[in-house]
Amino acid sequence: MAPAHSRTGKPQKPFRQNNRSLKRKRNEDDLSSLTQRVGELDPKSLAESFSELPLSDATLQGLSASHFKTLTDIQSRAVPHAIKGRDILGAAKTGSGKTLAFLVPVLENLYRKQWTEYDGLGALILSPTRELAIQIFEVLRKIGRYHTFSAGLVIGGKSLQEEQERLGRMNILVCTPGRMLQHMDQTAAFDTAHIQMLVLDEADRIMDMGFQSTVDAIVEHLPKERQTMLFSATQTKKVSDLARLSLRDPEYISVHEAASSATPASLQQHYVVTPLPEKLDTLWSFIRNTLKSKILVFFSSSKQVRFVYEAFRHMQPGIPLLHLHGRQKQSARIDITSKFSRAKYSCLFSTDVAARGLDFPAVDWVIQLDCPEDADTYIHRVGRTARYERDGRAVLFLDPSEEEGMLKRLEQKKIPIERINIKAKKQQSIMNQLQNMCFKDPALKYLGQKAFTSYVKSVHIQKDKDVFNVKSLPLEEFASSLGLPGAPRIKFIKGEDTKSRKNAPRHLAVVPSSDEDSDEEGLTKKKKENEVRTKYDRMFERRNQDVLTEHYTKLIRDEDEIDPDEKDNPAADADEDDGFLSVKRRFDAGDENLGEGLGSEAEIDGIKKGKAVQIDGKEPLIIDSKRREKLLKSKKKLLKYKGKGTKLVYDDEGNAHEIYEMEDEQQFKAQGDADAQRAKYLELEAERTRLADIRDKEIAKQKKREKKEKRRARARAEREAEDGPVAVLAPYEEDEGLREDDFSAEDRGSEDGRAPPSKKQKKWFQSDSDVDGEDGGKKRKRPRAQSPAQVETLEDLEALAAELLE
């Protein structure tokens, strides 16, 4: 029993320690025991669940709440090495759980070091794409919800100023390389001197030529004493790449290195050999036959994605369509990825933006309409399906020229793929529908031109020429399959043969064709003139009026616009490829008939340019269109075609001279020496200035004198107006008669013939209307009060008093 209190007599309560101190002590004990368990951990031992690993309670609670319990192969082998602080090179198949393999060690290592917001940035996670960075950040939020770390997402497309305000308080950052480097260079409060961990997801993509300079600049800002982890489905082993990141004895963990296939076993892989002009027909037929599926289609360029999306959207295949590419705004990209993730049945057209790392749930089909650049890109593309041991199917479309080379590349990477054929009965052609849509929508027609150009360019820039050969592709037929009348001009293809054309003998380029060839060309011309022109031919010869007209005209070049000589002349092609200087005509050296048969210049202009109208100008106005004909009705627009007018002055004798006449050298010398003329000129100008000064002074004196006279006259008029007689009103009496005393002496003086002025005289600055208006508008003045000398009766006194009171 507790002893009683000495003063109150009540039993004393037992002494309780502060709850905070107890909690702090308990946390310290847990941390020390966790550190001891990590030190005793054998990295080679393979655990099956997260609870078997030495992890903190906060991490275990976050994993359990996110329904992560069992470990995958890459997680069971990489996490023990990572939480012990070793550098890691991790490689595993797509969909094997690589994200948790580096997020769990990041949380654990910072937790054991008791990292707080006052310690600054502790871990940096780099991702090649924005969508993958968002996905990593969402997983980090789920499993780290019970930790006290502050985590941030830094990607392009968001407000830089808002990120700068919060960046200094972050402990973990998930970012893309470009935006991260921008903050390192521009954000003053951002400090990376204490970073403990650097993680590169999809490391082979980040370390390639596209991000090489950016990653090198980021690594220069980081301390060398740090832990570095690289994860990817196709890992790099280049010594140069590892040296750039300063890795120290990294642990290379490849889970499926000894596997028979580099792709998941549950993935069914097929390829279809289809000619390039039939690819869109095959894709349309495939979508129409698999409406109850979730499909992801990969293209090589964003222009192709936009064109196919707009075209198929108008034709309504019966399944929701989405499109994703790198030129969209970030908000639209996030919205599209979330829509496709939630959808049960949908078709997404995408570039390689969605090829790496993104986890779209339950994707049934991955279609690669364009051949991937290498086997690694193929692995990442097909990795969007068959994730986490689920079933999936992938189809690769190959042109006959790409089949042999691509199959060899896939075989080297241990990728099993089988060929399938398409049933001709189920294939449907959409070329006529595309032509009809291009006829109705000029914007879609222009987009088709850009899609064609971007595809050919993507094939042209590939390094593997055994697979990608532009010259072996049927470009004319491919353009027709897009609904276009012909293949647009591809300048970089013509430039390939510039060197061979330059080295060719000169006479081969300038010698005209034989008589037989010219006869054949003449027959071809006649056939084209007599050819029936359809509505579609006229439509495609039309010029756009609303969609980038000049740029579109450069892309398109019809056969009728090309000179026949230019077709057979390779030198002309080379000159046109230069685009700066173009050869108008070519002649053989020493041609005697060089100037014959040309006729006069006016004659040529009449043949080529049409009707000429002579206006006041030197050159005639050529009327070669209705717009020029309408221009004749506007005087304002015709001014620029008229000559400039000249102004003439006439002397006393009536001879015309121009305003400015220049003397020639002889006339100037006839007047004397230059110094003498200059002295004479100065003397004349000085005399002229003196006379002008005297004249100006006289004018100033005259104005001053007139002003003084006006002021005196005004003062005189005011004084006369004030000295005039004043009328005095007589008091009211009962009798109506008037007495003689009622008139003042001044009034009686009017009998002498002088009448007082009836109204106030106007001033010098007033007009008659001003005086009348003033008299009518103002209140009439009261009569002047009577003087005491004029008060004679009691009534006069009362009237005077009343006036004074008022």
Swiss-Prot record:
Family matches, as SMART domains: DEXDc, DUF4217, HELICc
Residues at which ATP binds: A92, K93, T94, G95, S96, G97, K98, T99
Chain intervals with Basic residues compositional bias: 702-714
Reaction catalysed by this enzyme: ATP + H2O = ADP + phosphate + H(+)
Compositional bias per record (Basic and acidic residues), positions renumbered to this chain: 692-701, 740-754
Main subcellular location of this protein, as a coarse class: nucleus
Pfam families, A to Z: CTE_SPB4 (PF13959), DEAD (PF00270), Helicase_C (PF00271)
Gene3D superfamilies named in the record: P-loop containing nucleotide triphosphate hydrolases
Record-level GO BP terms: rRNA processing
Domain-related comment: The Q motif is unique to and characteristic of the DEAD box family of RNA helicases and controls ATP binding and hydrolysis.
Primary role: ATP-dependent RNA helicase required for ribosome biogenesis. Involved in the release of U14 snoRNA in pre-ribosomal complexes. Required for pre-rRNA cleavage at site A2.
Quaternary structure note: Interacts with the U3 and U14 snoRNAs. Associates with pre-ribosomal complexes.
Protein name in the entry: ATP-dependent RNA helicase DBP4
UniProt lineage: Eukaryota, Fungi, Dikarya, Ascomycota, Pezizomycotina
